[in-house]
Swiss-Prot record:
Its main location: membrane. One of its GO terms (biological process) is cell-matrix adhesion. Residues 1-35 form the signal peptide. Residues 588-611 are annotated as: Disordered. The chain crosses the membrane at residues 639-668. This is Mesothelin-like protein. Residues 669-702 are cytoplasmic. It is a single-pass type I membrane protein. It comes from Homo sapiens (Human). Residues 36-638 are extracellular. Belongs to the mesothelin family. It is found in: Membrane. Pfam families: Mesothelin. Glycans are attached at residues 122, 307, 424.
Length: 702
């Protein structure tokens, strides 16, 4: 019988099975205050059918520690339910779930698992006969989830290409399409030389680098895609491009038929207004499109022959007809006052936003009234602390509206909240949920201290990854005060997890790193609590505190997630900890001191191609390290943990854990006869070609 833990919320009776323990834990620890707590009375917890009625909102609260107690059939049912409902789990949930699935031997059922989960799987366990099916499904996932696992992202690319190329060196057009979202890591030269049908995959990319955008425009300009040459593009064809159309250059827009371009402009404005297209992408398009219209290539007459009226502002093509200079000279203050919301629905360029701000200052010299403040979300970033000091903010709704923008408001957040607090406002859990963890990062220490503990508890798990170190210190102290009496260490960890970090996730920590986040004493306590910390949380810990943890502490802290150290060894936090260890200790882990070392402790005679001359590269996205933080070039993903010195140093219970986790810690060289070993010796030079015989590259060294 699983032991019940004390959790916030309604009192729960004795738990009858580990499956029910998990279900109730999920309900109690969902990220939002609306999480549902289910009664055990109406559920049959004896089998896998327990998960048949679990809904999406409940499953979003998935937590690995109680899931590790599930029998194999219930864990399998849970994973399949997650896939069926397309539950959007976060990286920290997926990484530990992948390790649980691997430990229970469930990876062979990958066709029934969520594509995002496959990104985290141990690739050496995928059978050669299944590799194409595995890559096809994994390529449907979001590779940005691997931002904290740079080496796993590298390994996934190498595995995919090794599988698709096989014994040959040519990557066919169909193979390129099979890469799915993985093509988001292709370098510019590869995109420019890729099969035109590659556009279908590039649509999956959340963003493209500047070089990739240039290559995309080169591909489109060639006229060999399904759209044809720019002069023959249609509205339907542009809409089929999806977000890729927002990267089209002004030079290409100037070649598009005017009626088609204007029709697409209208559709972008409409999509943005209803939330189908993000503000950032839409503004990128508008800027490019309007730039093309400043050149004398269009025969359209200028329509700005008189003052701007309310009817003019309702036209989706308003920005095409009026530039920012004409906006300043033709917009009357009275029209602006009564039609401010309509005007700001347009994706105004920065210059035009400054024009509107200046006109509002003329209309309201003593500061904007509160009813108007709720309309200027897109302009808030332009206001100084002094200007915000003139505002009167009495409503929580006004605060939510002002801080709802997706732009950085480092200087505005504190000022807006201060005006609200001056009118006896309070920072509630609902407000924290509405403005998100990013805004919490920019509150002053005093404002953070005014948050009532219960409100912080109601806010749930906020994303604090972008917080500066000084705020993380304050937030950790506040959260520790709030959750310090949560009962067991496991319950405490669930609530404290977002606040344990000491440096922004995925970024190179400053040197020296200011003290903050969870101190080493707390990390040691957590290591003995069987929490199995996920690798995302681990990489966000203060690197200076980690230096005081030995191999035993870290192994116990990560539990069944210890294998993820290899997947994240190039992450700055992990790399710094590895460098603090001596060579003999590293040998116990099967790792060398430097992730960029050309040699490693576990080489086989066969394996993936040598990366010294490898033409496959990875794009350095925001989540990937650069320069000295590149991934391992040793040709070995991992070495087994079954070393005698480590066995002698660890307790029996931990050895059992590592024994079950050994399948995660297998060198790629050990499967040389499989799909990762089909490339021959790594001693030579190998080039993978596309369908036309050109080298296929990926930016960054593998």
């Amino acid at each position: 019988m699983a032991a019940a833990v004390t959790i916030p919320g309604p009192r729960i009776g004795a738990l009858q099975s580990s499956g029910l323990t998990l279900l109730l834990s999920l309900a109690a620890h969902c990220s939002g205050p609306q999480a549902k707590v289910l009664s055990p009375g109406g559920l049959d917890a004896s089998g896998a059918n327990l998960w048949a009625s679990a809904n999406c909102s409940l499953l979003q609260g998935f937590w690995c520690q109680p899931a590790s107690q599930l029998p194999r059939d219930q864990l399998s049912a849970l994973i399949q339910r997650l896939a069926l409902l397309q539950v959007p789990l976060q990286a920290w949930q997926l990484s530990c779930l992948a390790n649980l699935a691997s430990r229970c031997g469930l990876q062979d059922d990958f066709t029934l698992h969520p594509p995002n989960l496959l990104l985290f799987y141990n690739l050496s366990q995928v059978r050669e006969a299944d590799c194409r099916a595995f890559i096809r499904r994994a390529a449907q996932g979001d590779v940005e989830l691997l931002s904290h696992l740079p080496d796993q992202r590298v390994a996934l690319w190498r595995a995919a290409v090794a599988c698709l190329v096989g014994a040959g060196l040519r990557l066919s057009a169909s193979d390129q399409q099979l890469l799915g979202a993985l093509v988001c890591d292709m370098d510019a030269s590869s995109i420019g030389a890729a099969d035109p049908h590659m556009l279908e995959n590039l649509r999956r990319c959340p963003r493209l680098t500047a070089a990739q955008r240039i290559a995309l425009n080169s591909l489109l300009a060639g006229g060999k895609t399904s759209l044809g040459p720019p002069g023959s593009w249609t509205l339907e064809g542009l809409q089929a491009l999806g977000p890729l159309a927002t990267y089209i250059s002004p030079h290409l827009w100037a070649q598009v038929q005017e009626a088609v371009g204007l029709g697409f402009f209208r559709s972008v404005v409409a999509s943005c207004q209803v939330g189908r297209l993000g503000q950032r992408e839409a503004r990128c398009f508008v800027t490019s499109f309007l730039e093309s219209k400043t050149k004398p290539v269009s025969s359209r007459p200028r329509l700005s022959t008189g003052n701007i009226t309310a009817a003019t502002l309702r036209d989706d093509l308003f920005l095409v007809h009026y530039d920012c200079a004409e906006l300043e000279s033709c917009l009357d203050g009275c029209i602006l006052r009564t039609n401010l919301d309509t005007l700001l629905q347009h994706l105004l360029p920065t210059e035009c936003q400054h024009v509107v701000k200046a006109k509002l200052a003329q209309i309201y010299p003593q500061g904007l009234p509160e009813d108007q403040l709720r309309l200027i979300t897109s302009l808030v970033y332009l206001y100084s602390r002094t200007e915000i000091g003139q505002w009167s903010i009495t409503s929580q709704d006004t605060v939510m509206a002002l801080l709802a923008s997706d732009v950085a408001l480092e200087n505005q957040t504190e000022a807006v909240l201060q005006k609200f607090l001056e009118h006896n406002g309070t920072v509630s859990g609902a407000l924290l949920l509405a403005i998100g963890g990013t805004r919490l990062c920019w509150m002053s220490p005093h404002q953070i201290q005014t948050i009532h503990p219960q409100e912080l508890r109601l806010a749930g798990a906020l994303d604090l990854s972008s917080c500066p170190q000084s705020r993380k210190d304050v937030l950790y102290t506040k959260a520790h005060e709030t959750f310090g009496s949560s009962g067991t260490l496991a319950a405490y960890y669930r609530l404290m997890r977002p606040y344990l970090g000491g440096s922004p996730g995925g970024a190179q920590p400053p040197s020296p790193v200011p003290p903050g986040g969870a101190p080493v004493e707390e990390l040691r306590h957590l290591a003995h609590a069987n929490i199995s910390m996920d690798i995302d949380t681990f990489t966000s810990l203060n690197p200076l505190e980690l230096q005081s943890l030995d191999v035993g502490n870290v192994t116990a802290l990560l539990g069944h997630n210890v294998g993820d150290l290899q997947k994240a060894r190039s992450h700055p936090t992990v790399r710094a900890w590895l460098r603090s260890l001596n060579s003999s200790t590293l040998g116990q882990l099967g790792l060398d001191a430097s992730p960029t070392s050309p040699t490693g402790p576990a080489h086989g005679t066969r394996g993936p191609p040598s990366t010294t001359h490898q033409v496959l590269h990875l794009v350095h996205t925001s989540g990937l390290p650069t320069n000295d933080a590149q991934a391992s070039t040793s040709g070995s993903l991992w070495a087994p943990l079954g070393y005698l010195p480590l066995a002698m140093a660890l307790p029996c219970s931990l050895l059992c854990l590592l024994h079950w986790g050994t399948c995660i810690l297998v060198s790629v060289d050990s499967v040389a006869s499989g799909w990762l070993g089909s490339q021959g010796s790594g001693a030579g030079k190998t080039e993978v070609l596309d369908s036309a015989g050109r080298p296929l590259g990926l930016t960054g060294q593998l």
